[in-house]
Amino acid sequence: MASSSDPWMREYNEALKLSEDINGMMSERNASGLTGPDAQRRASAIRRKITILGTRLDSLQSLLVKVPGKQHVSEKEMNRRKDMVGNLRSKTNQVASALNMSNFANRDSLFGTDLKPDDAINRVSGMDNQGIVVFQRQVMREQDEGLEKLEETVMSTKHIALAVNEELTLQTRLIDDLDYDVDITDSRLRRVQKSLALMNKSMKSGCSCMSMLLSVLGIVGLALVIWLLVKYL
């Protein structure tokens, strides 16, 4: 059994503690029932820790390949440590799958760095323990910066979506107002047409009465002329 003062065991204990923190955050997330931005922020925080844990596991794996000779780690202990890393990575993958991280595939695609365990081993093959720690912190810092940029992109996209939604709402309101104005204009036009029809009908009726009156006057005048001719001839 390795001593707790062993650098590898210290690193593993840190990774194990981080894994326990992630499990606790997942339990709180599932119990809270949060939705919307709050749920997204909590999920982002969990993904951030999972990404850091993945880097720590890669570092632990690389340290197993390059163990200082003075530590004299037996083959049995080496296999035990490999199993410990494998089990912890398996549990981490399960949590990542629950957050749709696809076993850290999203981490690589988002940051544009496909740093697989074999790649990490090759990069640290010539480093001492201090160099490996520095390399690990550099990778973690780069991933943190990538997460911050991703969050900025998400917020920018959200603001654009809100602006587009406001513009669509305004356009819809303008169209509704235009429809209302068209309805009012159509109603007024119908009333004007009805009034014109009544006026036309009244004018036709007035013309008929005038014609009858002129006819009566004509007949009376003709009768008067005939009477005068008969009387004086």
Swiss-Prot record:
InterPro entries: Syntaxin, Syntaxin/epimorphin_CS, T_SNARE_dom. This is Syntaxin-52. Residues 231-233 are vesicular. It comes from Arabidopsis thaliana (Mouse-ear cress). Signal peptide: none annotated. Keywords: Coiled coil, Golgi apparatus, Membrane, Protein transport, Transmembrane, Transmembrane helix, Transport. The chain crosses the membrane at residues 210-230. GO terms for cellular component: endosome membrane; Golgi apparatus; plant-type vacuole. Vesicle trafficking protein that functions in the secretory pathway. It is found in: Golgi apparatus, trans-Golgi network membrane; Prevacuolar compartment membrane. It is a single-pass type IV membrane protein. The gene is SYP52. One of its GO terms (molecular function) is SNAP receptor activity. GO terms for biological process: intracellular protein transport; vesicle-mediated transport. Belongs to the syntaxin family. Residues 137-199 form the t-SNARE coiled-coil homology domain. Interacts either with VTI11 and SYP21, or with VTI11 and SYP22 in the prevacuolar compartment, or with VTI12 and SYP61 in the trans-Golgi network to form t-SNARE complexes. Residues 1-209 are cytoplasmic. Its main location: Golgi. The keyword Transmembrane helix applies. SYP51 and SYP52 may have redundant functions. Expressed in root, leaf, stem, flower and silique.
